[in-house]
A protein has these predicted regions:
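TPR/TPR-like alpha-solenoid helical repeat scaffolds
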Residues: 180-181, 218-227, 259-263, 285-305
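Alpha-helical adaptor scaffolds
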Residues: 113, 147, 177-189, 193, ...
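Short coil turns that delineate tetratricopeptide repeat
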Residues: 136, 170, 212-213, 248, ...
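Beta/coil-rich, acidic/histidine-enriched accessory regions frequently appended to metallopeptidases
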Residues: 47-188, 269-272, 290-314
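Active-site-proximal alpha-helical
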Residues: 1-52, 206
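TPR/TPR-like (Sel1-like) alpha-helical repeat modules
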Residues: 196-205, 262, 267-285
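Canonical positions in the second alpha-helix
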Residues: 131, 164-165, 206-207, 242-243, ...
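TPR alpha-solenoid repeat register
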Residues: 141, 175, 216-218, 253, ...
Length: 314
């Protein structure tokens, strides 16, 4: 419950931390004597309490809770929740064998998604190019190349590879995404901003027609206004908030939504989103800034939005 302790843990300590965290979550959900306490903890967090204070308010004596957890861990039986299959709606599941090129490119795709440093990006794109040269007609291979090129900073090459992928498969989601990423990065330096961003949003608009509930087109439709220092349309703002509903785990997206809500003086909604950021144990500087803004929102009657935005962006 203490983010400060979390930050000082070793790698071994982190393993123990996550294990104990899941044990605590499981116990609070199924313990009759602790019924409702997890909801109370979440409520205290939403009121602006830090994790420790919220925990003390909800759980009481930490020593007693820890002893109960130790006993729960040693118990031979754990309570579970059964969900009958009739209560689930399962869509069609299709499985196929990877094509040869896809299999060869799988390591590149995994490393791209996991993230690489600048040196690793240059190494990865060389490998991706060699594979892509052997499988020029495989759209998945070309879209994976596009991703590697973008990560390496090669926007023009990423766009070319995306186009090759889309020429073979006009429903390749990753190809649209990588093309959009590259065009948006190019647009930052374009002399004709209006034309550049109109071109940049096109792949995301095309993706939106294929996947209406994909969050990235909704997010980038908002970004194009902000990047040009224009006031976002109501449709763009609503789309941004819908994107957060679709991807609530995305801290960067939540931050963007909170900024927009502060600009619009919708402080109640901004508080909800900032609360989720403020006490995130992984939050770093953003968590500290969010806590400061929350204090201002709750302690002052006439808050200047520009001052709050400045705090968050510092």
């Amino acid at each position: 419950l203490d983010p400060q302790t979390f930050g000082s843990l070793s790698s071994r300590g982190l393993d123990s931390f996550y294990g104990r965290s899941w044990l605590l979550y499981h116990y609070l959900n199924f313990s009759k004597s602790r019924k409702g306490q997890l909801n109370e903890y979440q409520h205290q967090i939403s009121l602006g309490q830090n994790s420790l204070a919220a925990g003390k308010a909800a759980f009481g004596d930490f020593g007693k809770l820890d002893r109960e957890l130790r006993s729960y861990l040693k118990s031979r039986k754990l309570t579970g929740l059964s969900i009958r299959k009739e209560a689930l709606t399962i869509g069609n599941v299709a499985v196929r064998q990877l094509r040869e090129g896809e299999a060869k490119m799988m390591d590149v795709r995994m490393r791209s998604r996991r993230g690489v440093n600048p040196a690793g990006a240059l190494e990865l794109v060389v490998k991706a190019r060699k594979i892509a040269d052997r499988y020029p007609d495989d759209p998945s291979v070309q879209s994976a190349l596009a991703e590697a090129e973008f990560i390496a900073g090669n926007d023009a090459a990423a766009i070319i590879a995306s186009n090759l992928a889309l020429a073979k498969d006009d429903k390749d989601v990753n190809a649209y995404v990588q093309k959009g990423y590259a065009l948006f990065r190019q647009a930052r330096e374009a002399k004709d901003q209006a034309t550049a961003y109109k071109k940049a949003i096109a792949p995301f608009l095309a993706l939106n027609k294929i996947e209406n509930d994909h969050p990235l087109p909704l997010m980038y439709n908002h970004i194009r206004f902000v990047a040009q220092k224009k006031a976002p349309s109501r449709n763009a703002i609503e789309g941004l908030e819908r994107a957060l509903e679709l991807a609530p785990f995305d801290r960067g997206l939540r931050f963007r939504v909170a900024l927009q809500q502060i600009k619009d003086r919708r402080y109640d909604w901004a508080e909800r989103n900032l609360s989720a950021l403020a006490f995130d144990p992984h939050g770093g500087k953003l968590s500290v800034a969010s806590q400061e803004v929350l204090k201002r929102l709750r302690g002052e009657k006439n808050v200047d939005p520009s001052e709050l935005i400045k705090i968050l962006k510092e």
